[in-house]
Amino acid sequence: MRIGIVTETYSPEINGVALTVAGLVHGLAQAGHAVQLIRPRQKSDGPAAAIEERIATTLVRGMRLPRYPGLQLGLPAGRRLRALWKSERPDALYVATEGPLGMSALRAARDVGIPASTGFHTRFDDFARHYGLGALTSLVFAYLRRFHGLGAATFVPTVELAEFLGGRGFHNVVRLPRAVDTNLFCPSKRDEALRAQWGVGADQLAVIYVGRIAPEKNLPLAVRTFRAIQRLIPQARYIWVGDGPARAALEAQNPDFIFAGVKSGEELARHYASSDLFVFPSLTETFGNVTLEALASGVPTVAFDYGAAREYLTSACGRRVARGDDDGFAAAACLLASDAVAFAAARTAARRCVAHLEPATVVANFVRALAELSGAGNAQSAPTDSVDPAAAPRREADESAAVSTAPARAECRGSLPVHP
């Protein structure tokens, strides 16, 4: 199948949307599909469009975002895209981001008769409220309804988000689960030498935060939660992976914290696997890929009950806390960190919570959905569970049941210490 993908952010930019789209693009190519990628030019790009095996990239103009220097909006490119698609027409188009480039791509696809679908990756209404722009929420949703209404379907990663958008006038919202690379994110990547660099011994607790270090990530609760853990386990250390506008102040106020900077690929996997507890208090995620990465790495996780946590984080592998319950969040993290039996069981079970989210399975479901929307019945996709927006996510059969201690997937298993 020939699939066009339009996105305003892409690897090596480091954010959830960029990494999700890049994983999808390469998964499609590996499955034998021809991918036409349209994205803004990045600093690392040469003067010509890139050509990879089964991936043809068209670069367009972009504009940097204030306060987010690592991100940019793609500028409208409708005329160029119409010309491109008249000569190199894809069977289906997927528009991953809702900026000017995405809007122009949807209109161009409509003009030349290419079936298009969209992805809902970012809760812009949450960002607007966080930055004191809540009065703009109705305008934001009006734009988003118009944008996604130009596509035949809108793909979302969770049942929760599908129901949320359906209640706000979005039509044909389809749940498509996210994937996690369980070969990359793996307990066997645990590195005692890295822990030694952090000043963490084999029997000490390393708490980790991974993500943008920015005000919208609820960082005061992260600090408060760790300090509560530290009162119970004085030798605990807090590792921060990422960067952002709040880092300098956070570092100055907490000189005992370890700031590792931005990590990706194998380095990121080593940091996850070398930690012991992932504490993620953000309330502004559309999904939260980091939750899947931590669980795949065998790291028990504490997060609020929405997004990826609601879909995949069970009491077997961590703790979900009601949104906005800051006291409950800190208490849950403390109880898990200080209960040796529960902690050991969660470490054993964490990877199993996401082991079924194989990239190849998610790609096959994506292709099947595009084929149905475009009428391309000859699309080649392996037999998989159908994409069903109303289907409940896979969960442990009974979250209150005793935790099984059966080993996680054997191909990626490492030694897992017990704390405290």
Task: Indicate where each model-derived feature is located.
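Nucleotide-activated donor-binding/catalytic signature segment of Leloir-type glycosyltransferases, i.e.
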Residues: 247-267
